[in-house]
């Protein structure tokens, strides 16, 4: 059955292609949709010069019809008067056709600024589509829906569903993010997850759920079905599907309406091509060579302290065996105790890793020799400007073609990291190939975090390592231009590494199709119990330029990336600060158990209780505030009673203990709430200026001591260690209280400096970790 569908659809594309088109006319769009079983209005296509008979119109039913011009030049018919609603009589339809034949060419020519002459437009008109006027449910917002499919250059085909009609862009801009549009991959989601992706949409609730006493206009499963059928079309004609000749670049229905409980697809457009993408994955064995080499070669090392020499020193200082370091340096016997060789060809063996630090114009000759002489299994190209400075793109292309030719012939070819990268730091590999001097960058020390950082920007990578210097990454990988190895390659490798438990990625852009590989690898990593955090830059409105469809306009590249990564279970950070906080908190919460999304909130300041409650819901999920069990309420009252706070405040969630609460009262409440069976996680927020709490290190001016066992920090440390539930702390204060924050974090508690950040993290954590 499926094969028959694909064959029938392919014939439609082939017919259009033979006429020199890469898009379908609307009658052909109807034919395609009908092939896949969609509900359509009754219609008839009249070739130019043909007018309808009365009997033909009666078969359409109804008193009115819609007449639409059909031309390969005219995609937006309404803009040029190419759509008219008239009575369903032969005379009215003929008059409408005559009117459009006269006026549409003139309007189109005028709108094009004279680029298309009226005679050319008139010649392009192939006929007119006469469609029954569908009487559909009119409920205001939500009456018209949008269903789209498009090929994202990063992720391949994606399906979009949301509000439709003429106000698509307006609604998408003004509705809260996550409530205007659902963006779904064409594969990898169960029926349950497809439905869960539609549930948050404002239009879905309006038409598929009871609304102010009105019964649903359509069953949720009906909308789920049309979305899944579009997913099927996306799979059948995907750029990744080599079994079909065509790729559906774009398919859009706007509007989709509801008639008598069934979806009916009214207006449609489609673009297609023969473009196909081969997703060529690098082998794990080759990537292991670059991350855990047994031998390293270098070129570009001068006797003076240049970039290459700094890299050599960093490699040696990280404990790599000098006897397995080979430097290409004519005229020298040794440098820094490492053997030198006159040329690449003279290297005594094929090294696992070769580091190339020459200028961009010298890269290709060295790469050619490395490849042809088979002297390296992997290469890091540090060269700055490669692929960015004008004239260097051809160098990258030459290197790609060199590798591609070897691989197609089945000959050995190295994998390449870079170019234009800062290098790699590998603890298992015992090397640091970055070119930052030791005195300018203090390597993170202390907690071995099971963390791998993969970043398109080396500077971003080092900045995050500098600010999070309490946690030592297993790997820190600056991928640069992704000339060969990509973000998807690295994630696909790291997901299977037992020493890696958290993967943090900074992404500016994916190579074509690599976003899909990244998405799949992220899903597998998360299913295996790992955590993945992503900060994605490049958020300009990519798809908002003039385009043939609304789908590309409202579902730009960043929106697609964010939506799919969230569905994979990735923690998507909106800010750099969130990115840092998420990494820190994930490391410190390792081993805590996630049971649900019920949270307990506590603060000694009323404003924080309000702000925390404001952040319970987001597009990544929601937290609920359970009522405390009676025994919990009793324990809280007992903790507050000695200070008389029980007479000032009722016990509810969030709990405001007031600035009067001392260390014992505050932490007694924390302990009671965290022990409650109704609570799955907790935010402990403290404004530390109150004299009632010990929040400062010892000094002559006061008697406080944050290091004491009975202090706030001492008590929280004990509570945190004894509970399996995730708990995060917020200290909303300035540098005076940095010692308190540092002490808490050294003892394993994740600390935030704003309560909204703390709640936002816990919301993402409790929702995404359960996937």
Where do the PLM segments sit?
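Catalytic-core regions of core metabolic enzymes
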Residues: 1-771
């Amino acid at each position: 059955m499926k094969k028959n569908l694909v064959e029938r659809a392919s014939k439609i594309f082939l017919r259009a292609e033979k006429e020199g088109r890469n898009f379908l006319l609307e009658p052909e769009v109807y034919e395609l949709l009908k092939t896949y079983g969609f509900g359509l209005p009754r219609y008839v296509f009249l070739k130019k010069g043909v007018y309808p008979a009365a009997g033909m119109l009666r078969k359409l039913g109804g008193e009115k019809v819609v007449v639409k011009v059909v031309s390969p030049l005219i995609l937006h018919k309404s803009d040029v008067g190419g759509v008219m609603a008239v009575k369903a009589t032969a005379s009215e339809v003929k008059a409408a056709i005559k009117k459009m034949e006269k006026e549409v060419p003139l309007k189109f020519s005028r709108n094009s600024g004279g680029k298309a002459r009226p005679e050319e437009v008139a010649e392009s008109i192939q006929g007119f589509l006469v469609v029954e006027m569908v009487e559909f449910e009119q409920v205001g917002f939500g009456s018209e829906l949008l269903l789209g499919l498009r090929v994202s250059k990063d992720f391949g085909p994606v399906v979009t569903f949301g509000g439709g009609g003429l106000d698509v862009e307006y609604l998408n801009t003004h509705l809260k993010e996550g409530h205007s549009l659902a963006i779904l991959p064409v594969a990898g989601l169960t029926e349950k997850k497809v439905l869960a992706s539609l549930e948050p949409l404002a239009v879905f609730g309006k038409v598929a759920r009871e609304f102010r006493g009105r019964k649903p206009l359509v069953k949720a499963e009906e909308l789920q079905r049309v979305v899944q059928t579009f997913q099927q079309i996306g799979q059948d004609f995907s750029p990744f599907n080599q079994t079909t000749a065509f790729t559906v670049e774009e398919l859009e229905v706007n509007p989709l309406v509801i008639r008598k409980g069934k979806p009916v697809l009214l207006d449609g457009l489609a673009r297609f091509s023969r473009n196909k993408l081969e997703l060529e994955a690098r082998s794990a064995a080759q990537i292991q060579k670059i991350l855990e080499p047994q031998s390293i070669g270098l070129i570009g090392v001068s006797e003076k302290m240049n970039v290459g020499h700094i890299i050599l020193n960093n490699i040696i200082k990280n404990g790599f065996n000098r006897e397995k370091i080979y430097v290409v340096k004519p005229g020298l016997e040794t440098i820094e105790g490492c053997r030198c060789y006159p040329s690449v060809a003279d290297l005594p063996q094929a090294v696992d890793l070769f580091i190339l630090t020459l200028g961009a114009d010298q890269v290709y000759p060295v790469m050619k020799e490395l490849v042809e002489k088979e002297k390296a299994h992997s290469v890091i190209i540090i060269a700055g400007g490669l692929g960015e400075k004008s004239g260097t793109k051809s160098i990258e292309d030459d290197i790609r073609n060199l590798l591609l030719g070897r691989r197609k012939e089945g000959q050995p070819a190295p994998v390449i990291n870079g170019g234009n990268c800062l290098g790699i730091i590998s603890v298992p590999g015992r090397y640091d190939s970055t070119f930052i001097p030791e005195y300018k960058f203090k390597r993170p020390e202390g907690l071995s975090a099971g963390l791998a950082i993969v970043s398109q920007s080396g500077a971003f990578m080092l900045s995050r390592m500098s600010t999070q210097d309490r946690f030592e990454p297993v790997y820190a990988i600056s991928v640069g231009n992704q000339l060969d190895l990509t973000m998807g390659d690295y994630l696909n490798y790291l997901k299977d590494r037992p020493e890696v438990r958290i993967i943090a990625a900074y992404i500016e852009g994916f190579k074509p199709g690599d976003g899909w590989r990244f998405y799949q690898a992220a899903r597998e990593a998360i299913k295996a119990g790992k955590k993945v955090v992503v900060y994605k830059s490049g958020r300009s409105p990519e798809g908002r330029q003039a385009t043939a469809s609304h789908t590309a306009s409202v579902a730009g590249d960043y929106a697609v990336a964010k939506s799919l990564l969230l569905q994979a279970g990735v923690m998507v950070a909106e800010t750099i600060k969130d990115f840092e906080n998420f990494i820190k908190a994930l490391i410190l919460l390792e081993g805590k158990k996630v049971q649900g999304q019920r949270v307990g909130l506590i603060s000694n300041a009323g404003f924080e209780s309000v702000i925390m409650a404001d952040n319970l819901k987001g597009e990544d999920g929601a937290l609920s505030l359970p009522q405390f069990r009676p025994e919990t309420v009793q324990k809280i009252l007992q903790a507050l009673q000695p200070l008389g706070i029980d007479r000032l405040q009722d016990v509810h969630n969030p709990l405001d203990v007031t600035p009067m609460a001392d260390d014992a009262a505050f932490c007694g409440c924390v302990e009671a709430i965290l022990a409650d069976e109704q609570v799955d996680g907790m935010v402990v927020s403290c404004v530390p200026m109150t004299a009632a709490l010990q929040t400062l290190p010892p000094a002559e001016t006061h008697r406080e001591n944050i290091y004491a066992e009975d202090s706030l920090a001492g008590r929280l440390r004990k509570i945190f260690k004894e509970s399996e539930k995730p708990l995060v702390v917020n200290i909303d204060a300035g540098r005076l209280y940095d010692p308190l924050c540092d002490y808490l974090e050294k003892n394993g508690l994740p600390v935030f400096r704003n309560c909204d950040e703390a709640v936002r993290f816990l919301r993402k954590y409790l929702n995404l970790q359960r996937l």
